[in-house]
From Swiss-Prot:
It comes from Bos taurus (Bovine). Keywords: Calcium, Cell adhesion, Cell junction, Cell membrane, Cleavage on pair of basic residues, Glycoprotein, Membrane, Metal-binding, Phosphoprotein, Repeat, Transmembrane, Transmembrane helix. It comes from the Eukaryota. PROSITE patterns: CADHERIN_1, CADHERIN_2. A component of desmosome cell-cell junctions which are required for positive regulation of cellular adhesion. Promotes timely incorporation of DSG2 into desmosome intercellular junctions and promotes interaction of desmosome cell junctions with intermediate filament cytokeratin, via modulation of DSP phosphorylation. Plays an important role in desmosome-mediated maintenance of intestinal epithelial cell intercellular adhesion strength and barrier function. Expressed in esophagus and rumen. Weakly expressed in epithelia and cardiac muscle. Residues 90-197, 198-309, 310-423, 424-528, 529-644 form the Cadherin domain. Residues 666-863 are cytoplasmic. InterPro entries: Cadherin-domain_protein, Cadherin-like_dom, Cadherin-like_sf, Cadherin_CS, Cadherin_pro_dom, Cadherin_Y-type_LIR, Catenin-bd_sf, Desmosomal_cadherin. This is Desmocollin-2. The keyword Metal-binding applies. GO terms for molecular function: calcium ion binding. Coiled coil: none annotated. Interacts with DSP, PKP2 and JUP. Interacts with DSG3; the interaction may limit the interaction of DSC3 with p38MAPK family members and therefore repress p38MAPK signaling activation.
Length: 863
């Protein structure tokens, strides 16, 4: 039955083979889909695949066809509709098959195709497709009148497993009463192909001593007959093993996996086995076809054999004092594979090489052990050395032997050699007191002949004598003092180099260390010859003495002033002992600044003393590093010396004078224009005293207001000083009012903030501005010139007086000191923002106050 049509050309234009994955459906070349017989559509039959392939390019494509069950809806018959008629069934011959390699006779009848329309028409039958008009051509034909289908030759299934032909039924005049019919001819398989191994010869490796069941390898064979039939069901087996005994391998009949059947594989006995294997189809039955192949199994080596010495003992000889010389080669036997880690030997010296005179290495070419001398031997000390050497492989031992190291004994005979003198020990010492008289003789360096053990016949000479202090006797090695020996000059030890030689000219080198014993030949001295005493901050200085002699001739020291009892030194200075090596020098009277020479005698514990002329500088400074020495005249002529603080005081005085003159000039020009004060000049200093406030007042910061009095200008040019205020909180300048009836200007200090009073003109008035250009919170109280002069004059005078005092005290008094707590005081009143405002502008609101505030305003007005 015709189902539908698929457009195959859109998918694959060059398809040479078209067939369906489901035998219930047939596909024609034009894409028509037919059912081969009546089927019941179920969920399993909901889809099938059309397979398209090109046999030349081996290109394949698939088209998925989905089938939907459609129920026909019957309409109500109308009079004008035609009467429904039963459709006849399509012609559909049963599928047929042809045995592979059929012997005929040919042509061989297959089946008859016949159309039901032959009852009404004269039908001619024809076929087309592969095997008819396509390669392979002329394998099939059909009789035109009867529809009998014939095969003309035998067919190989492995080449053409099936043929899809299209049958046509037509009338003589060309009318086609039937749809084309797809006819599938299957080729029945015959067991005509023997299985073939993928390789003609296989090669595998397995380690010796492997356990039973160890996998060696797997073989594989293929069969071109029809899959999933008895013709392609294969069985594997081992036909023969060489060497035949013992049987060591087995093969799985289905998978072809070869495994070990014994653990007695020994590479040292047999390193390769050859197996003849067979594969047979028909599930291994005797009539099945079979093929054989060769499998070679190589036995891999493991370190199951220990290396063994060819001899158990060896004898070698070597001359004394020889180094880096080969004295013996030892060989080993090893059955493992040559030139592998299982065969290569590692030699070690197990015993007898405690002094490190020997080493043994492996010759990589011969695997022999090479014994060498790396440190000279001494015949006089040892004439024979017995060594015990061992050998192992590079790879770990995997055998069953308990001992893993093979050992041998080597006897090394040391041969005597005529040697030169021996300097032993190389460094020798002799102790001599320093300052011994020139010409003193003492023992010197000694070398000896190792053959005789004596120093007879050995000659000595110096090779190095840095100071030329000694001479060496060439026959005995005795040293003679040529110059005065000074222990302090050579740090207690003086080294000279000696060359000792015998009559044959053989030499040895040695060092003679002369240890100089100390004598008390040095008095203690004071290294620091100049002492600075800052008179303003200290009254003494500490001096320290040192003694280059050894401690036994050193401290404790005794310090004293050199001079008679009534000398000027004793009247001016005093020494006080601090510890064993230091004393404190202090002046007694109020000495002038200047430089003094004080002789100080220091005596060590044994009475050796030395006088040091100590230069003491009395300086006007804070630290000794700040001192710049100024000479002092000891006669009646005195010079006036100005310090830096005195110069600063002079400059400040000049600046103060300039400020006073500037203030007077400004006051004279602006006094006539001053407006009357709004508030009275009462005892409260123009502040409203509020007594009924129980809470703290508000902290307010206001914009810059005109300071109605005359301000002091900034620093005078050319003087180098500034008169200003320092910022304490947030960089703001404040003028605080004291409630006790005095108005003060307070200057505050905070690191890094300096401001100056600058003269500005604004509306004809002089104001106090911050040098930083920011707002300045000021008290707008009006000061008169007399009040300002009363306030500034005593303070400036006090600062000028303090400039010549000590720098430390001056710095402490030059700033407002901040205290954490000053005790509990009386309850403070609240001063609001309006009580501090002194502008004469913006007070018109007082004229419009209510009745409650008029009395208060009249009270505050200055009459």
């Amino acid at each position: 039955k015709f189902i539908g049509r698929v457009n195959l050309k859109e998918c694959f234009k060059s398809a040479t083979l078209i067939h369906s994955s489901d035998p219930d459906f047939q596909i024609l070349e034009d894409g028509s889909v037919y059912t081969t017989h009546a089927i019941l559509l179920s969920s399993e039959k909901s889809s099938f695949t059309i397979l398209l392939s090109n046999t030349e390019t081996q290109e394949e494509k698939e088209i998925l066809v989905l089938l939907e069950h459609q129920t026909k809806v019957l309409k109500k018959r109308h009079s004008q509709e035609k009467v429904l008629r039963r459709a006849k069934r399509r012609w559909a011959p049963i599928p047929c098959s042809v045995p592979e390699n059929s012997l005929g006779p040919f042509p061989l009848f297959l089946q008859q195709i016949q159309s039901d329309t032959a009852q009404n028409y004269t039908i001619y039958y024809s076929i087309s497709g592969p095997g008819v008009d396509k390669e392979p051509r002329n394998l099939f034909y059909v009789e035109r009148d009867t529809g009998n289908l014939f095969c003309t030759a035998s067919i190989d299934r492995e080449t053409y497993p099936l043929f899809e032909l299209v049958a046509f039924a037509t009338t003589p005049d060309g009318y086609t009463p039937e749809y084309p019919l797809t006819l599938v001819i299957r080729i029945e398989d015959e067991n005509d192909n023997a299985p073939i191994f993928t390789e003609t010869s296989y090669s595998f490796e397995v380690f010796e001593n492997s356990k039973v069941g160890t996998t060696v390898g797997q073989v594989c064979a293929t069969d071109q007959d029809e899959p999933d039939t008895l013709h392609t069901r294969l069985k594997y087996s081992i036909i023969e093993q060489f060497p035949a005994l013992p049987t060591l391998f087995s093969m799985h009949p289905t998978t072809g996996v070869i495994t070990t059947s014994s653990s007695k594989l020994d590479r040292e006995l047999i390193d390769k086995y050859q197996l003849k294997i067979k594969v047979q189809d028909m599930d291994g039955q005797y009539f099945g076809l079979q093929t054989t192949a060769i499998c070679i199994i190589n036995i891999e080596d493991v370190n199951d054999n220990l290396p063994t010495f060819t001899r158990s003992s060896y004898v070698a000889s070597v001359e004394e004092n020889r180094i880096d010389v080969e004295i013996l080669r030892v060989a080993v036997r090893d059955k493992d594979l040559i030139n592998t880690a299982n065969w290569r030997a590692n030699y070690t010296i197990l015993k007898g090489n405690e002094d490190g005179n020997f080493k043994i290495v492996t010759d990589s070419q011969t695997n022999e052990g090479v014994l060498c001398v790396v440190k000279p031997l001494n015949y006089e000390e040892k004439q024979q050395v017995t060594l015990e050497i061992g050998v192992v492989n590079e790879a770990p031992y995997t055998g069953t032997s308990r001992s893993t190291t093979n050992m041998a004994t080597v006897t090394v005979n040391v041969q005597n050699q005529d040697e030169g003198p021996e300097c032993d020990p190389r460094v020798q010492t002799v102790r001599i007191k320093e300052n011994v008289p020139v010409g003193t003789k003492t023992i010197g360096y000694k070398a000896y002949d190792p053959e005789t053990g004596s120093s007879s016949g050995i000659r000595y000479k110096k090779s190095s004598d840095p100071e030329g202090w000694v001479d060496v006797d060439k026959n005995s090695g005795v040293i003679t003092i040529l110059k005065r020996l000074d222990r302090e000059a050579r740090s207690g030890v003086y080294n000279i180099s000696i060359i000792a030689s015998d009559k044959d000219g053989r030499t040895c080198n040695g060092v003679l260390g002369i240890v100089l014993e100390d004598v008390n030949d040095n008095g203690p001295v004071i290294p620091q010859r100049t002492v600075v005493i800052c008179k303003t901050v200290m009254s003494s200085a500490e001096i320290v003495a040192v003694d280059p002699d050894e401690p036994i001739h050193g401290p404790p020291f005794d310090f004293s002033l050199e001079g008679v009892s009534d000398s000027e030194v004793l009247r001016m200075w005093r020494l006080t002992k601090v510890n064993d090596t230091a004393a404190r020098l202090s002046y007694l009277n109020d000495l002038r600044f200047g430089k003094y020479t004080v002789p100080v005698r220091v005596t060590d514990r044994l009475g050796q003393s030395l006088v040091t002329q100590l230069v003491v500088i009395l300086c006007d400074c804070v630290t000794p590093n700040d001192c710049s020495f100024r000479p002092v005249s000891r006669t009646g002529n005195r010079e006036v010396i100005l310090g830096k603080w005195a110069i600063l005081a002079i400059l400040l005085g000049i600046a103060l004078l300039f400020c006073i003159l500037f203030t007077l000039v400004c006051g004279a020009t602006t006094g006539a224009d001053k407006k009357p004060k709004v508030f009275p000049d009462d005892l409260a200093q123009q502040n409203l005293i509020v007594s009924n406030t129980e809470a703290p007042g508000d902290d307010k910061v206001y914009s810059t207001n005109d300071f109605t009095t005359h301000a002091v200008g900034g620093s005078a040019h050319g003087i180098g000083g500034t008169l200003g205020s320092r910022v304490k909180n947030g960089g703001q300048e404040t003028i605080e009012m004291v409630k006790g009836g005095h108005q003060t200007m307070e200057s505050c200090q905070e690191t890094g903030h300096d401001h100056t009073l600058e003269r500005c003109k604004e509306g004809g008035q002089h104001t106090l501005d911050s040098c930083r250009g920011g707002p300045v919170a000021t008290d707008n109280c009006k000061y008169t010139y007399s009040e300002w002069y009363t306030y500034t004059q005593p303070r400036l005078g006090e600062k000028v007086q303090q400039c010549d005092q000590d720098n430390t005290h001056m710095q402490a008094q030059d700033y407002v000191l901040t205290y954490n707590y000053e005790g509990r005081g009386s309850a403070a009143g609240s001063v609001g923002c309006c009580s501090e405002r002194q502008e004469e502008d913006g007070l018109e609101f007082l004229d419009h106050l209510g009745p409650k505030f008029r009395t208060l305003a009249e009270t505050c007005m200055k009459r």
